[in-house]
């Protein structure tokens, strides 16, 4: 994933910063506890597509 794109992207819900988890192929918003998938190097920034994180952040 392009580093410049990561600098621009924010959470669509809270507008906070995202953490890139390469191994899981997702972008994580810690305040919202959501993980947005990355498919074919394209981040899917839709709330309906996001995965809810567990209490331990996984």
UniProtKB/Swiss-Prot annotation:
Signal peptide positions on this chain: none
Record-linked Gene3D superfamilies: 2.20.25.10
GO CC annotations on file:
cytosol
Coiled coil (UniProt feature): none
* PANTHER family in UniProt: PROTEIN PREY, MITOCHONDRIAL, ZGC:162634
Q: Which HAMAP family match?
A: UPF0434 (MF_01187)
Q: Which family does it belong to?
A: Belongs to the UPF0434 family.
- Full protein name: UPF0434 protein Daro_3207
